[in-house]
Amino acid sequence: MAKLLLFLLPAILGLLVPRSAVALGTNYLLSGQTLDTEGHLKNGDFDLVMQDDCNLVLYNGNWQSNTANNGRDCKLTLTDYGELVIKNGDGSTVWKSGAQSVKGNYAAVVHPDGRLVVLGPSVFKIDPWVRGLNSLRFRNIPFTNNLLFSGQVLYGDGRLTAKNHQLVMQGDCNLVLYGGKYGWQSNTHGNGEHCFLRLNHKGELIIKDDDFKTIWSSRSSSKQGEYVLILQDDGFGVIYGPAIFETSSKRSIAAS
């Protein structure tokens, strides 16, 4: 099980991730992807549904787009500017989140606290499909979840998992991505004791040891905000942020 703790240490890279054809994640939607009618994004008890009545509903998160019966065969997409858009089957626009930023790669995520959050653009990417210094072979490790948010920590063999890919903060102080063709690692084996990985509120991944000495950093730095590291189903580990749109509790919505 991934060990996630909330830390109070604040502290990103301007890198845009090239578009690749990837499968829709279970709890995230990337720029250019579509959530079809009756499609779901889930995180624990929270379920985002693009309903057949054209209403986008976050069950147990007390939010909806209020577009019931405004169209048929509706679909939700996330643009390259971080805007969520619901379109009717005829292509007309039914609803927009209204939040836009610079062109890039964004992610809409069902947050574990019950919010729908759009973060981006991407600021850092771990690539296990390219041969290089950080390559290593795949080995079998048990699975857990795929998201690390700002302020959260992985330590003591804590891991993120997605399909056949696993990002592990190993007890030997090495951060390792198992999967892809070549895998990836931070090359910090044996460089510290009781090391942990933290994503800060400026989008930077940092490995620190028990004395809080920095062992490794993604060297990505952007403005203060909320970020997320997603271990995607295609094997890429990508940091998106800051948040440019998020839902808040409105009224309770009963499941139909």
UniProtKB/Swiss-Prot annotation:
Beta-D-mannose binds at residues 51-55, 59, 63-64, 170-174, 178, 182-185. CDD domains: B_lectin. The keyword Transmembrane does not apply. One of its GO terms (molecular function) is D-mannose binding. Disulfide bonds join 54-74, 173-195. Keywords: Disulfide bond, Hemagglutinin, Lectin, Mannose-binding, Repeat, Secreted, Signal. SUPFAM superfamilies: alpha-D-mannose-specific plant lectins. GO terms for cellular component: extracellular region. InterPro entries: Bulb-type_lectin_dom, Bulb-type_lectin_dom_sf. Its main location: secreted. A motif (Carbohydrate-binding motif 2) lies at residues 170-178. Mannose-specific lectin. Shows agglutinating activity towards erythrocytes from rabbit. This is Mannose-specific lectin 1. It comes from Remusatia vivipara. The gene is L1.
